[in-house]
C-alpha cells in the first residue's frame, strides 16, 4: 500500500469552488503486457520507456522540473522485498503463499507517522490481518523540482498477511480496511487528513506515482530501476493538469484505472451517487455501510471519483470491463454492428434505466491484477492505438511508436474506436476484443426479458386544440407567470412557425439581471457553462448519432445487485411532454401524485423558506407511501389573488436537494407541470436541477392562441407564413425546444440528457447563499446577491401586476432583446452610436467627451460599473505619462471574419490598426494575399488599383491583419496565411456563443469569399463547435507547437471565454506554451447566434480576467504570458479597469464596428446590412461610409483618455498599473434588487500583495526548443536546395517524439517564395514512427515519405506537396487491415496529396478543402464538413460519413454493402459512378496511389477493374451534384 497527500495546491478557491469545478487534466496513458512469458524486468523498463516517450503529452510546473504527475501500476515487487530480507520472505517462495499477502502504498507526512501506524494497527487487528512489515520506499529527493520538493510526502509501504483469505476475497477485505483507515484518519487534525493518501492496497498490484516528469519517475523511485523488479503487465500515465500546483495524490494511475480526458457530468454523477448510497444498506455491503459511505468526494478530481465508483463495482463482484460498460456506455442506439449482437443492446437498455453515464472524452486504461485493458468514450475523443505481436507482447497507448517492437513480429496494429474496449486476461493469457468482451458480459442476465416485462413507453399523443381565453385573460396569465411581449412574439411564436430557436446578432448589451432595474425571472441569474480546451463541444446536428434526449421515469434500484423489477420504468423519447401525455402517466404501473406549488401569498408567521420546506416534506411523505412519480404543478383553474406559485426552478431544486440529503432521491422521479417555462434555457435549468420531464402547459396554450389569432391565419393564407395545423405549430415549438436542449448539452460536450439530468452545469450570478443552499447546492455563486426574501418580494410584485383593474390588451415590451426607448437599457443605444459617429468623423474632442459621459454616467450594466478608482499617489502632469503611441500599441480589434464583414470593412479595420501600431484580427476565413504587401499603387487622386473599393488610403498603408485567426473551420488557413502573421490566434470560443460552431450562410459566400475559403460560391459553410485537433489541454499544446513550427516569429494567442474555472484552464494554456491568453466576455458581438446563447452563456470578462490573473500569479506563471481582454470595451476608463485587473492588451469589437460606420441594425445574419458593413451584397457594400481615419480618430481619443486617467492617478504608464487591483473601491450605489452583492472577487481574490505581482518581461515569442526540422535545416544540402530551388533526397530516422515534422521547412519556403513559386523538390525519406502533426502545413515542393506509421493530425493544413506512408517492408501482415494513421488527418487541408497504405482513424479529411487522398480504411465521421478535394477509401469505414459535407468528392469501396447505413444523408447522397469522367478520376488517382505505395489492395482492384468498379460509391454533396448533372446531360445528348 502506498500513501500520499500533500494538498498544497495554490489554485484559488473563488467563493467556495468545489475542487471538481477547478480540477481539469489530460495526459498520455497506456498499458503493456506479455502473454506468453513469465514476469520480467523488461516489462517494467518498457513501460517506463513508453512513459518517457509521451513526456510531451504531460505538463510541468513553473520550475520546468516538477511534473504535473507521472506513475505506473505494476505487480508487487516481491523479489525486491525478498532481497531486503524482510522476515516473512521464506513464505514467498511459493506462488500460492503470495496470494494471502497484500501491500499498501502510502503517501503521507512524516510528522505524524506514529499516529498513522497506530491507526493501521487498530484497523488490521479489527479485520484480523497480520502486520508483517513497514517499509520506507527508497527515493532520490535530489531530482525533485522546487514545487514537487515542497510538497513531497513520505512514501511508505505496509505489508500485511491474512491467514484465511486469498485473491479477490482478500482484496475485498483490504478495500474495507483501507476505507476504515481513511475514516479514522479523517477524524484527526485537518493537516494530517489532507496529507494522507493510500495509493493502492492490493494483493496483486501496486502504484508508484508522484509530481514528477516521466523520465524522473524511475530516478525518484529506486525500486523501478532495480533489475529484480518483475511484472507481466504495466499501466502508465503522464498527466497534464490545468491546476498548476498538482497534488501528489492526483497523479495517476489511480487504484484501478488511469484516465485521459474529462468527465463533464461529474457534479450530477456525484449527486446521484450520493442519493443511491443508501441502497448499500440493503445489499452485500449492509454491514459496512458506515465504513464505505461516502463512496465519492466532492473534493476529489473526476478521475479519482470515477475510480472510486469503479472500485466499488469491482469489489462487488464485477469485472472492470462490465463496470465500465455500465459507467461509460457506447452510443449503442445508432451502431449498425450491434444488429449482430442484440443481447449487448439489451444490456445497455437495462442499465440506462439505472445509471446515468459518466460522460465526456475518456480513454480509460484499467487493471485489477487479473485483467488489464482499455475502453474509449462514446464519441472516440481520445486516441488509443495498439500493437500485438506473435510472441505475445501487447501495447496500447495514446500514441503509437512508444514501445520497441520488431516489425517482423507484428500481428495486428489497430485502434480503439468510439465506445470500444480491448483487454487482456492475464490469468488465461488471452486478448479479448470488443465484441467478445461485451457479448460475454451481456449474457449474464436475461436483460431483454426484464426490460420487456417491466418497462413501458410513453406514446406521443395529440396536442390540445382548444383555446378558451380572450386576450385580456391570456395577458393576465402571461403577466402572472412573467412573460413579456418579446417572449411571446420573438421566442414562442418564432418557434411555433419555424421549429427553430430565434437567431440574433451583435451580442448582449443589457445590464446583468442583478444590476437591472427591470424584473427578471430566477432563470436569468444562471449562466450556462460550456466546453473549452479541456474537452470538446459536440455538433448536435451532424453528430446526432451519439446524442439522445431519452429519459426514464421511475425509481432506481441497487445497480450492484441487478434484478428484473429494477427495469420498472416509463421511457420517454423527449423530456418535453404535452398535457395529454402528462395525463397518460397515470395509466402505467408506476404510482403518480400531483403536488401543488401554489402557496399563500400572505406568509404571516411562516417564512417563504418554511413554505418551500413544507412542500419538500410533503414529497417525503408521498415517497414513504410508495409514490414513484411526483408531479410538481402550478396549474390551476383560476388564478388566485391570495396565492402565488413557487418558481418551478426554485421548487424543483429544493425538492431535489432535500431528497438527496434524505437519501430518497433515487426512489422517485420529478415531473414539472408549469406555466413558467418557455425558452430552451428554462428547460435546461429545470432538467439540470432534477426534473425528468416538463409539461409547459402555458407555452403550449400560447402557441394555440397564436395559431387561432386572425392575423396568423391571414399570414398563412397569403403565404407569408407556412401553412400549419394547430398540431404542427405545437409540434414545431416542441421540436425547437428539443433542438435547443441538444445544443445546450452539446456545448458542454455532453451527449445524453440522462447525463445532463441533475448535473447542475451552470454558474450563478447574483443569488445569495441561502438560495443556493436551499435549491442549488454545489452550484457556485461568486457574487452572492438576492436573498430568498428578496426573490419572494420581487416575484410578488410581478405576480400582483396580473390583478390590476385595467390589464393591458398587449403585454409590455421591456426591451430585453431589442432596444426600445424607456425599456431596458442598452449600452449600444442610438444616442451613443450617433454621438460616436459624429465624434470620429469630425475628429471632435467635445463630442467624444459627450460620448464618454454617456457611457461613464450610465446606470450600472456590468460589474465593473460598480467600481471606482482610488490612488496612492499625487496627480502628475500628462506630459510625464507615456505617449499616445505606446498606449495604441496595446489595442487590437476582435476577430471578425471576411465573409461576416464586407471586404471594405475588413480591410479598412486592418489598415487603420496598422497605421496606429495596433493589431487587427482577421477572424476566421483567410485573407487575400494581395493584402500581405503595403499599398504602393495610389494615383494622384489617392485611389489604388488593387484596392479601388477603398477610400482615404495613403502610400505604405498595409491591409494585412497582424493577428491571423485559426478557428475550428480552418477556412483560409494556408502556409502563406500563417507566415504572414505577427500573431496567430487560436479561437477556442466566442463570447456571444461559446461552445458552438458557426455558419456562414450561402448567400454571404460570394465568389470572392469562396475563393479565399477554398469552397464553392453560394454554399453554406459550417465551422464545427470544436477544433477537431483540440479535445484536451495536451492537444491544444500540440497546436500551439505546430503554429510555432510554421511561423517561429509569430506569437501564439489562445482566445477563451470567461466562465467558472477559467483560471485553471488559463494555467494549462500557459503551460502549453502560449504567448498570449485572451479573455472574452459574454457580451461580445456576433454575426449570428441563438438568442439563448447570447443571453445565457458565458460570464463577464471582469470575473474571468480577475480569476485568470490571480491564478497565474499564485502559480508563478503570470510572467509567461500576455493577458488580453475583450468584450464591451468602449472607453479609456474601461482600459484602466481592465489593466488593474491584470490585462496588458485590449480588444475592441462592437465599438470599432460602430466607429467604422455600423448603425447597430442587428441584421448581420441576414446579409442585409443597410450600410455595407456586414454584407456581401455589392449594392449595399457601395454604401459603406467608413474610411481608415475614422477609426484611427476613435483609438486616439481612447488612448488620450487613458493618459489623462493615468495622470490623475499619478502613474506614468499602463505597465505600472497592471494587476494593482487594490486601486479599486466599491461605489456607493444602491441597487434596486439587493444590497448583498459581493465584488471581492474583482479586486482582492488573493489579498494581493504587490510584491507578488511579477514584473512582466515577456519573451518576444516562445520557442519549441531544438526539433527535427531544425536539425534538417542545419544541413547545408537542404538549405542549398531551398535557396537554389533544386532537388534533394535525404534519409532520416523518426520517433514519435518528433512532432510536426515538415512545418518549419514549409514555413521557410513559403516565406521566401510565397504560395506557389518554389520550384525545387525536397524528398525526405523517414523510417520509424512519426509523432503528431506529421506533414502539417507543408507546401509545394515538399515530399515526405514514411516507412512506418504515424500518429494523429497527419497532413493537417497541408497546402501542397505529398505525404506517402507505407508499412515497413519486413511487416508480414496485410497492410490494408492495419492502422497506419491516427485521428483527424488531412484536417483543413487546402492542397497536396496524402497516400497511406493502411487504415486511418476517426474524422479523416474533416474540413478538407482541397486535399487529395487515398487510404485503405477510416473510422467514424470521415469527410465531415468537407468543402473540396478528393478522397478515396479502399477498406472498412465507420459511421456518419459525409456529415456536413458541402463540397468535394469521395469514393468508397463498399465490399460488404454497409455504406448506406453509415452515410449521413442530411446533405450528401451516395450514387454509383455514373459518368466516364468519374471513372477516370477514380482510376487516375488509384493508379498514382499504387505507384507511390505499392499497395497490394490497389493493385488487386486495378487488375480487376470492372469487377471492383461496381462496388464503388461516389459521395456527392449538392454543390457537386449540379456539376455531375450537367456532365450527364452532355453525355446523353452526345451518345444517346
UniProtKB/Swiss-Prot annotation:
This is Ferredoxin-dependent glutamate synthase. It comes from Antithamnion sp. (Red alga). The lineage of its organism: Eukaryota, Rhodophyta, Florideophyceae, Rhodymeniophycidae, Ceramiales. Belongs to the glutamate synthase family. Its cofactor is [3Fe-4S] cluster; FAD; FMN. The keyword Magnesium does not apply. Gene3D superfamilies: Aldolase class I, Glutamate synthase, alpha subunit, C-terminal domain, Glutamine Phosphoribosylpyrophosphate, subunit 1, domain 1. PANTHER family: FAD NADPH DEHYDROGENASE/OXIDOREDUCTASE (PTHR11938), GLUTAMATE SYNTHASE (NADH) (PTHR11938:SF133). GO terms for cellular component: chloroplast stroma. SUPFAM superfamilies: Alpha subunit of glutamate synthase, C-terminal domain, FMN-linked oxidoreductases, N-terminal nucleophile aminohydrolases (Ntn hydrolases). It is found in: Plastid, Chloroplast stroma. [3Fe-4S] cluster binds at residues 1158, 1164, 1169.
Amino acid at each position: 500500500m502506498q500513501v500520499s497527500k500533500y494538498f498544497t495546491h495554490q489554485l484559488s478557491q473563488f467563493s467556495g469552488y468545489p475542487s471538481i469545478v477547478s480540477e481539469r487534466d489530460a495526459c498520455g496513458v497506456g498499458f503493456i503486457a506479455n502473454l506468453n512469458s513469465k514476469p520480467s524486468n523488461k516489462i517494467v523498463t518498457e513501460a517506463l520507456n513508453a512513459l518517457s516517450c509521451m513526456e510531451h503529452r504531460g505538463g510541468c510546473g513553473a520550475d520546468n522540473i516538477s511534473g504535473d504527475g507521472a506513475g505506473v501500476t505494476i505487480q508487487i515487487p516481491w523479489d525486491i522485498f525478498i532481497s531486503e530480507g524482510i522476515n516473512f520472505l521464506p513464505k514467498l517462495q511459493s506462488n500460492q503463499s503470495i496470494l494471502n499477502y497484500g501491500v499498501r502504498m502510502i503517501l503521507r507526512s512524516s510528522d505524524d507517522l506514529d499516529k498513522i501506524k497506530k491507526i493501521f494497527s487498530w484497523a488490521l487487528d479489527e479485520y484480523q490481518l497480520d502486520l508483517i512489515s513497514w517499509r520506507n520506499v527508497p527515493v532520490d529527493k535530489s531530482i525533485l523540482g522546487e514545487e514537487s520538493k515542497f510538497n513531497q510526502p513520505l512514501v511508505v509501504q505496509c505489508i500485511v498477511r491474512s491467514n484465511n483469505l486469498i485473491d479477490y476475497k482478500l482484496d475485498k477485505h483490504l478495500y474495507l480496511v483501507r476505507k476504515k483507515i481513511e475514516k479514522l484518519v479523517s477524524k484527526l487534525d485537518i493537516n494530517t487528513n489532507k496529507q494522507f493518501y493510500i495509493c493502492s492496497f492490493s494483493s496483486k498490484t501496486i502504484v508508484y506515482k508522484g509530481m514528477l516528469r516521466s523520465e524522473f519517475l524511475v530516478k525518484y523511485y529506486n525500486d523501478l530501476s532495480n533489475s529484480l523488479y518483475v511484472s507481466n503487465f504495466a499501466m502508465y500515465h503522464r498527466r497534464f493538469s490545468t491546476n498548476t500546483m498538482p497534488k501528489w495524490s492526483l497523479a495517476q494511475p489511480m487504484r484501478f484505472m488511469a484516465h485521459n480526458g474529462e468527465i463533464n457530468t461529474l457534479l450530477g454523477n456525484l449527486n446521484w451517487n450520493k442519493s443511491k448510497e443508501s441502497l448499500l444498506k440493503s445489499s452485500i455491503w449492509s454491514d459496512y455501510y458506515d465504513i464505505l459511505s461516502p463512496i465519492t468526494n466532492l473534493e476529489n478530481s473526476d478521475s479519482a471519483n470515477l475510480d472510486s465508483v469503479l472500485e466499488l463495482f469491482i469489489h462487488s463482484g464485477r469485472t472492470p470491463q462490465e463496470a465500465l460498460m455500465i459507467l461509460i456506455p457506447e452510443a449503442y442506439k445508432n451502431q449498425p454492428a450491434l444488429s449482430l449482437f442484440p443481447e449487448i443492446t439489451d444490456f445497455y437498455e437495462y442499465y440506462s434505466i439505472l445509471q446515468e453515464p459518466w460522460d465526456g472524452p475518456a480513454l480509460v486504461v484499467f487493471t485489477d491484477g487479473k485483467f488489464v485493458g482499455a475502453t474509449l468514450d462514446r464519441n472516440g475523443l481520445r486516441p488509443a492505438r495498439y500493437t500485438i505481436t506473435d510472441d505475445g507482447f501487447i501495447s496500447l497507448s495514446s500514441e503509437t511508436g512508444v514501445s520497441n517492437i520488431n516489425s517482423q513480429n507484428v500481428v495486428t496494429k489497430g485502434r480503439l474506436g468510439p465506445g470500444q474496449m480491448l483487454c487482456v486476461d492475464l490469468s488465461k493469457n488471452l486478448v479479448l476484443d470488443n465484441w467478445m468482451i461485451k457479448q460475454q458480459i451481456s449474457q449474464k442476465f436475461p436483460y431483454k426479458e426484464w426490460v420487456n416485462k417491466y418497462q413501458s413507453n410513453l406514446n406521443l399523443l395529440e396536442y390540445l386544440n382548444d383555446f378558451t381565453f380572450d386576450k385580456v385573460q391570456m395577458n393576465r396569465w402571461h403577466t402572472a407567470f412573467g412573460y413579456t411581449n418579446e417572449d411571446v412574439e420573438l421566442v414562442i411564436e418564432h418557434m411555433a412557425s419555424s421549429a427553430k430557436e430565434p437567431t440574433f446578432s451583435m451580442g448582449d448589451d443589457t445590464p446583468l439581471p442583478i444590476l437591472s432595474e427591470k424584473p427578471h425571472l430566477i432563470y436569468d441569474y444562471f449562466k450556462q457553462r460550456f466546453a473549452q480546451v479541456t474537452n470538446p463541444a459536440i455538433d448536435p446536428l451532424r453528430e446526432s448519432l451519439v446524442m439522445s434526449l431519452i429519459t426514464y421515469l421511475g425509481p432506481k434500484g441497487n445497480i450492484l445487485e441487478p434484478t428484473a423489477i429494477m427495469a420498472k420504468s416509463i421511457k420517454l423519447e423527449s423530456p418535453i411532454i404535452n398535457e395529454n401525455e402528462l395525463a397518460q402517466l397515470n395509466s402505467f404501473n408506476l404510482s403518480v401524485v400531483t403536488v401543488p406549488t401554489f402557496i399563500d401569498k400572505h406568509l404571516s408567521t411562516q417564512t417563504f423558506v418554511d413554505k418551500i420546506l413544507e412542500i419538500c416534506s410533503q414529497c417525503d411523505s408521498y415517497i414513504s407511501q410508495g409514490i414513484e412519480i411526483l408531479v410538481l404543478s402550478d396549474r390551476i383553474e383560476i388564478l388566485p389573488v391570495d396565492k402565488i406559485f413557487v418558481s418551478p426552478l426554485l421548487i424543483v431544486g429544493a425538492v431535489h436537494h432535500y431528497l438527496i440529503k434524505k437519501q430518497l432521491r433515487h426512489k422517485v422521479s420529478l415531473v414539472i407541470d408549469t406555466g413558467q417555462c418557455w425558452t430552451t434555457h428554462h428547460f435546461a435549468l429545470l432538467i439540470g436541477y432534477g426534473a425528468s420531464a416538463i409539461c409547459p402547459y402555458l407555452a403550449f396554450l400560447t402557441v394555440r392562441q397564436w395559431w387561432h389569432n386572425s392575423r396568423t391565419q391571414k399570414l398563412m393564407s397569403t403565404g407569408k407564413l407556412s401553412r400549419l395545423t394547430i398540431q404542427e405549430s405545437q409540434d414545431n415549438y416542441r421540436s425547437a425546444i428539443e433542438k435547443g436542449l441538444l445544443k445546450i448539452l452539446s456545448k458542454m460536450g455532453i451527449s445524453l440528457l440522462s447525463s445532463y439530468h441533475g448535473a447542475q452545469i451552470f454558474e450563478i450570478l447574483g443569488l445569495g447563499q441561502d438560495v443556493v443552499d436551499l435549491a442549488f447546492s454545489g452550484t457556485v455563486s461568486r457574487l452572492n446577491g438576492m436573498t430568498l426574501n428578496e426573490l419572494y418580494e420581487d416575484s410578488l410584485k410581478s405576480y400582483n401586476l396580473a390583478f390590476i383593474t385595467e390589464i393591458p390588451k398587449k403585454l409590455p415590451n421591456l426591451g430585453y432583446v431589442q432596444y426600445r426607448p424607456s425599456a431596458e437599457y442598452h449600452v449600444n443605444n442610438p444616442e451613443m452610436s450617433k454621438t460616436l459617429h459624429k465624434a470620429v468623423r469630425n475628429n471632435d474632442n467635445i463630442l467624444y467627451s459627450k460620448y464618454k459621459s454617456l457611457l461613464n454616467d450610465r446606470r450600472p450594466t456590468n460589474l465593473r460599473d460598480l467600481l471606482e478608482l482610488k490612488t496612492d499617489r499625487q496627480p502628475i502632469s500628462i506630459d510625464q505619462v507615456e505617449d499616445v503611441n505606446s498606449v495604441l500599441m496595446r489595442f487590437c480589434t476582435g476577430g471578425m471574419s471576411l465573409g461576416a464583414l464586407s471586404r471594405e470593412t475588413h480591410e479598412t479595420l486592418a489598415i487603420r490598426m496598422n497605421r496606429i501600431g495596433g493589431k487587427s484580427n482577421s477572424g476566421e476565413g483567410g485573407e487575400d494575399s494581395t493584402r500581405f504587401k503595403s499599398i504602393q499603387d495610389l494615383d494622384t487622386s489617392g485611389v489604388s488599383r488593387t484596392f479601388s473599393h477603398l477610400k482615404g488610403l495613403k502610400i505604405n498603408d498595409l491591409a494585412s491583419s497582424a493577428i491571423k485567426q485559426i478557428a475550428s473551420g480552418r477556412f483560409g488557413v494556408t502556409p502563406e496565411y500563417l507566415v504572414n502573421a505577427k500573431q496567430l490566434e487560436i479561437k477556442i470560443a466566442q463570447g456571444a456563443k461559446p461552445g458552438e460552431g458557426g455558419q456562414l450562410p450561402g448567400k454571404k459566400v460570394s465568389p470572392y469569399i469562396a475563393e479565399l475559403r477554398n469552397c464553392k460560391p453560394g454554399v453554406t459553410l459550417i465551422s464545427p463547435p470544436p477544433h477537431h485537433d483540440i479535445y484536451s489541454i495536451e492537444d491544444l499544446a500540440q497546436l500551439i507547437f505546430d503554429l510555432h513550427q510554421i511561423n517561429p516569429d509569430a506569437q501564439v494567442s489562445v482566445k477563451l471565454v470567461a466562465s467558472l474555472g477559467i483560471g485553471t484552464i488559463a494555467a494549462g494554456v500557459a503551460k502549453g506554451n502560449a504567448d498570449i491568453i485572451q479573455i472574452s466576455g459574454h457580451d461580445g458581438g456576433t454575426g449570428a447566434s441563438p438568442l439563448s446563447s447570447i443571453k445565457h452563456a458565458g460570464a463577464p470578462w471582469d470575473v474571468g480576467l480577475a480569476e485568470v490573473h490571480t491564478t497565474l500569479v499564485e502559480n508563478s506563471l503570470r510572467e509567461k504570458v500576455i493577458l488580453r481582454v475583450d468584450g464591451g470595451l468602449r472607453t479609456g476608463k474601461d482600459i484602466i479597469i481592465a489593466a488593474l485587473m491584470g490585462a496588458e492588451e485590449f480588444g475592441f469589437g462592437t465599438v470599432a464596428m460602430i466607429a467604422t460606420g455600423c448603425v447597430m441594425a442587428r441584421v448581420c445574419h441576414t446579409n442585409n446590412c443597410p450600410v455595407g458593413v456586414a454584407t456581401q451584397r455589392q449594392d449595399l457594400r457601395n454604401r459603406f461610409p467608413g474610411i481608415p481615419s475614422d477609426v484611427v480618430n476613435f483609438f486616439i481619443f481612447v488612448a488620450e483618455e487613458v493618459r489623462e486617467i493615468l495622470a490623475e492617478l499619478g502613474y506614468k504608464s499602463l505597465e505600472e498599473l497592471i494587476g494593482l487591483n487594490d486601486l479599486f473601491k466599491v461605489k456607493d450605489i444602491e441597487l434596486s434588487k439587493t444590497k448583498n452583492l459581493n465584488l471581492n472577487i474583482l479586486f482582492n481574490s488573493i489579498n494581493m500583495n504587490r510584491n507578488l505581482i511579477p514584473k512582466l518581461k515577456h519573451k518576444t515569442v516562445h520557442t519549441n526548443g531544438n526539433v527535427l526540422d531544425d536539425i534538417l535545416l542545419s544541413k547545408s544540402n537542404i538549405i542549398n536546395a531551398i535557396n537554389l530551388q533544386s532537388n534533394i533526397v535525404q534519409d532520416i530516422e523518426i520517433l514519435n517524439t518528433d512532432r510536426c515534422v515538415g512545418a518549419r521547412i514549409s514555413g521557410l519556403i513559403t516565406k521566401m517564395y510565397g504560395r506557389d513559386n518554389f520550384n525545387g523538390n525536397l524528398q525526405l525519406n523517414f523510417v520509424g514512427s512519426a509523432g503528431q502533426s506529421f506533414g502539417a502545413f507543408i507546401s509545394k515542393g515538399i515530399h515526405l515519405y514514411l516507412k512506418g506509421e504515424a500518429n494523429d493530425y497527419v497532413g493537417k493544413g497541408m497546402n501542397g506537396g505529398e505525404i506517402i506512408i507505407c508499412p515497413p517492408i519486413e511487416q508480414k501482415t496485410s497492410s490494408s487491415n492495419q492502422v497506419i494513421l491516427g485521428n483527424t488527418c488531412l484536417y483543413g487541408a487546402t492542397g497536396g496529396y496524402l497516400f497511406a497504405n493502411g487504415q486511418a482513424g476517426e474524422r479523416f479529411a474533416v474540413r478538407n478543402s482541397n486535399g487529395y487522398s487515398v487510404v485503405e480504411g477510416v473510422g467514424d465521421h470521415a469527410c465531415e464538413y468537407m468543402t473540396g478535394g478528393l478522397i478515396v477509401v479502399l477498406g472498412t469505414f465507420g459511421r456518419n460519413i459525409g456529415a456536413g459535407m458541402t463540397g468535394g468528392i469521395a469514393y468508397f469501396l463498399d465490399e460488404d454493402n454497409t455504406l448506406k447505413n453509415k452515410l449521413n444523408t442530411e446533405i450528401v447522397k451516395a450514387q454509383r459512378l455514373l459518368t466516364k469522367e468519374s471513372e477516370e478520376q477514380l482510376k487516375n488517382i488509384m493508379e498514382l496511389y499504387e505507384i507511390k505505395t505499392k499497395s497490394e489492395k490497389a493493385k488487386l482492384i486495378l487488375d480487376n477493374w470492372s469487377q471492383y468498379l461496381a462496388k464503388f460509391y461516389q459521395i456527392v454533396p449538392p454543390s457537386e451534384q449540379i456539376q455531375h448533372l450537367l456532365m450527364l446531360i452532355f453525355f446523353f445528348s452526345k451518345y444517346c
